């Protein structure tokens, strides 16, 4: 569904085309910003890892201790990974686990995941091409040419610029949450851009956006994938909650984070997909019965997803 998030922000991108770009290394997957997967471009991956890696490592310390991942083990694992992937040899996580076992390094489950995240943050590995439905790892230096890296101050400013261009209007706390940076760093990034940004006060909070850009009204319907940027990229998500949003929610299955139906900028329900080789079924669970106009726009959103999933 991550590829569907890309398609929603592209012109007629299909699942096959998105997969092809990923396999070719035009889009990479790694742990950046926060301790979770993100798609990044080859041009951005190194400076993003250098900027956000230290904060991610700090978040990982508890699980490292819990699963016995220490500096000595990481050094041994890095050597095994570098040898195993050398020469364009793309391996799955299970295959790398077998390589570790061959070198008498016993690690699995969350501990293995921790080791591989550290390898990503070290700029040792990144995503390789898919093998069927399985993800592989590649050596970053073989996948992405080395180049100049932004210094820390410039990197914070550039990340702020990217965020508010694509997510504004938003607050400094929104940017801090999304980027994983401290609130102090987030505010410094905003301040460094000076006249590039304008701001407005709404309900007691200061919202920043690109100067000269008028926030557009969101009209229409979209079927968003789980953990879509429209909902999770903000510390305060109250502005997308409509009047029909369920008041009592299970935090483990919060509709904000699942596949949501978005109508005119507000959450209006959830949806599910069932895919076969010839068919893409979409099941809707609206929070309330939509009006006729909303039903028509939701139907168009369903058709767009079907076209994405089925077109070659």
Residues of each region from the PLM?
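Long, low-complexity intrinsically disordered regions
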Residues: 1-239, 243-312
């Amino acid at each position: 569904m991550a590829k569907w998030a890309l398609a929603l922000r592209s012109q007629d991108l299909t699942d096959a085309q998105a997969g092809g770009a990923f396999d070719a290394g035009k889009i990479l997957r790694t742990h950046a910003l926060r301790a979770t997967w993100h798609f990044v471009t080859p041009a951005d991956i190194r400076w993003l890892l250098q900027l956000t890696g230290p904060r991610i490592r700090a978040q990982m310390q508890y699980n490292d201790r819990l699963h016995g991942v220490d500096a000595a083990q990481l050094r041994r694992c890095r050597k095994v990974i570098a040898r195993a992937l050398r020469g364009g040899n793309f391996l799955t996580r299970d295959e790398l686990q077998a390589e570790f076992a061959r070198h008498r390094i016993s690690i699995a489950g969350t501990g293995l995941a921790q080791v591989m995240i550290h390898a990503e943050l070290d700029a040792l590995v990144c995503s390789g091409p898919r093998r069927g439905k399985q993800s592989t790892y590649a050596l970053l230096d073989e996948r992405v040419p080395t180049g100049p890296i932004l210094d820390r101050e410039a990197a914070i400013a550039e990340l702020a610029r990217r965020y508010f261009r694509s997510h504004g209007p938003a607050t400094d706390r929104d940017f801090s949450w999304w980027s994983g940076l401290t609130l102090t760093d987030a505010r410094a990034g905003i301040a460094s851009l000076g006249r590039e940004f304008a701001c407005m006060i709404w309900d007691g909070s200061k919202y920043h956006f690109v100067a000269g850009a008028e926030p557009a009204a969101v009209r229409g319907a979209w079927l968003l994938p789980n953990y879509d940027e429209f909902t999770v990229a903000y510390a305060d998500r109250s502005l997308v909650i409509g009047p029909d949003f369920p008041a009592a929610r299970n935090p483990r299955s919060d509709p904000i984070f699942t596949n949501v139906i978005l109508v005119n900028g507000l959450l209006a329900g959830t949806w599910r997909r069932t895919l076969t080789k010839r068919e893409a079924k979409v099941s809707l669970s609206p929070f309330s019965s939509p009006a006729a106009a909303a039903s028509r726009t939701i139907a168009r959103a369903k058709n767009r997803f079907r076209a994405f999933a089925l077109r070659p």
